[in-house]
Amino acid sequence: MRIFKTNVLLRFVNSYIIDSPQPANLSYLWNFGSLLALCLIIQILTGCFLAMHYIPNVDLAFDSIEHIMRDVDNGYILRYTHANVASFFFIFIYVHIGRGLWYGSYRAPRVLLWSIGVIILVLMMAIGFLGYVLPFGQMSLWGATVITNLLSAIPIFGQDIVELIWGGFSVSNATLNRFFSLHYILPFVLAALAVAHMIALHTHGSSNPNGLTSNGDRYAMYPYFIFKDLVTIFAFFLVLSIIVFFYPNLMGHSDNYIPANPMVTPSSIVPEWYLLPFYAILRSIPNKLLGVLAMFGSLLILLIMPFVDFSRTRGNKTLNPINMVFFTIFVCNFITLGLVGANHATEPFIFLGQVCTTIYFAYFFVIVPVTSILQNTFLDIATIINKSA
């Protein structure tokens, strides 16, 4: 193992993966970082192989996907693995963010770590949207048309920006070429951000369920936490294999198996499932510009968490029953937003979406600051009582 400490490149690997000291009390919720790294590697590899056979042309894109499925050796495995790992990627990052919110991992000194993570989430959504357009089925075409048209809400320059993205006056060959180029290159930018995320993590070390910084009770990453990560990695491969080989279209949309036809509008136009909560927020506001701002704001609002949580304690929210109740409501509300986004924009889903959107933003702007101030007040009262006793 001496080479890991003397070689310039391997010393970096040793510092971050092998000898990195980790808190002894990390639970399995801390395993999602390694699962996300694995998903990114799988996506880049399968994406590179798929790009060898894909043709970014409006007349040939759909047929090239069918060629991959039917004629390329194990092409169907490549395509279904790429599509389903994308879904798992978002499942894992939502749990990863939820864990950060639950345990206060966004608190100083890890503000930079949290901020990079939010940027990664936004970039992932952009990459996912670009990839959804590439098969050029019905949902791809109309999804691209609707989502890119949102930019027309920008005053004065909106329509010009939309036409610049399209490369014309509608989704066309130029659009598909641009989306393919960006979908190919942006995952490498995502990988660079993931490395920056790791560097920021290594600077102050990983958080832990108690929220306490302790340099004494730590173990090396290898072998303890490496083998712990392998448990969830093997479980992930088991579930992924079952879905890829038995239920490959479980998280897909049937309309995307119909070639794109600009003359026929699908009965419902919905994005991929992992974008549905934010799509519901967009639809819940009648004004187009305000809806677009709310949708992007619902992502970027995560950046303010380190500044609106005034609590003097950190760690598990079970230490504060009030926070625990409101966080549970927030999670249920987020899931409800996803269900609302999957349904048509009719009553009662319009009203339900507006209520859920209000709760979503209220959690960050009202609930977190108020509950943290209440917690500090109760702690001060308890301290005064203990001193006077």
From Swiss-Prot:
Residues that coordinate or bind a ubiquinone: 202
Cellular component per GO, a single term: mitochondrial inner membrane
Function: Component of the ubiquinol-cytochrome c reductase complex (complex III or cytochrome b-c1 complex) that is part of the mitochondrial respiratory chain. The b-c1 complex mediates electron transfer from ubiquinol to cytochrome c. Contributes to the generation of a proton gradient across the mitochondrial membrane that is then used for ATP synthesis.
Keyword Electron transport annotated: yes
InterPro entries per record: Cyt_b/b6_C, Cyt_b/b6_C_sf, Cyt_b/b6_N, Cytb/b6-like_sf, Cytochrome_b, Cytochrome_b_C_euk/bac, Cytochrome_b_N_euk/bac, Di-haem_cyt_TM
PANTHER family in alphabetical order: CYTOCHROME B (PTHR19271:SF16)
Cofactor binding note: Binds 2 heme b groups non-covalently.
Extra remark: Heme 1 (or BL or b562) is low-potential and absorbs at about 562 nm, and heme 2 (or BH or b566) is high-potential and absorbs at about 566 nm.
Subcellular location: Mitochondrion inner membrane
Protein name (database record): Cytochrome b
